[in-house]
């Protein structure tokens, strides 16, 4: 391994920490976060085809408390989205997923966790699909029960059925829930394809 590689990894990690600290430190930075429609923020947009999953501008204080904003900021939605996706992409680049394999060593799913609420926003970043399509193929299924937890499955021959209750539990116990809706991510973009909520079908 090149002696420069460890330094590069440390540099990237420190950059991510600094960006997250800037976002979470004073509670003044605008972030575009995913959440559930039950949150009822003053300004929101639904993900494509979603009934329960929204994007909303927010600030996050030092302790991680979310405060929805009444407007996306001076630059509008585009500036807020560009800045948030840049931070989310850097967070994604420094987050190692837990890769789950079956008894034959076949990769079944990936689970992403992080302290930052921007983790869920990372599914909208340009780097998310290339990173996981290299593992699961060109079409992915995503479950986002919380802002700091994302499940990634291949679209076909996946373990989603066996994980339904675990994902529901994650949603119910999380202090930062998103929704139980399921999403397909492909070169065509992100779209809602179903739900794990038995009462919302």
Named regions from a protein language model:
Residues 1-11:
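Bacterial N-terminal signal peptides that target proteins for export
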Residues 11-19:
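Bacterial N-terminal signal peptides
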Residues 4-5, 17, 181:
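Serine/proline-rich low-complexity intrinsically disordered segments, especially terminal tails, linkers
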Residues 24-201:
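Contiguous interface-forming segments/domains that mediate binding rather than catalysis
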């Amino acid at each position: 391994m090149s002696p420069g590689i460890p330094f590069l990894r440390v540099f990237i990690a420190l950059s991510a920490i600094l960006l997250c600290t800037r976002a979470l430190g004073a509670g003044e930075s605008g972030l575009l976060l995913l959440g559930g429609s039950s949150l009822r923020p003053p300004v929101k947009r639904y993900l494509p085809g979603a009934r329960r999953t929204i994007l909303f501008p927010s600030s996050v204080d030092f302790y991680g408390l979310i405060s929805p904003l009444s407007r996306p900021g001076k630059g509008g939605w585009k500036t807020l989205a560009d800045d948030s996706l840049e931070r989310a992409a850097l967070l994604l680049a420094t987050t190692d997923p837990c890769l789950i394999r079956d008894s034959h060593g076949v990769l079944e799913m990936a689970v992403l966790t992080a302290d930052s609420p921007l983790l869920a926003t990372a599914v909208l970043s340009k780097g998310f699909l290339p990173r996981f399509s290299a593992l699961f193929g060109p079409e992915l299924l995503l479950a986002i029960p919380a802002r700091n937890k994302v499940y990634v499955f291949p679209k076909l021959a996946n373990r989603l059925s066996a994980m339904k209750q675990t994902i529901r539990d994650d949603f119910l116990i999380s202090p930062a829930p998103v929704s139980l809706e399921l999403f397909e991510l492909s070169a065509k973009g992100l779209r809602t394809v179903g739900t794990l909520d038995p009462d919302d079908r």
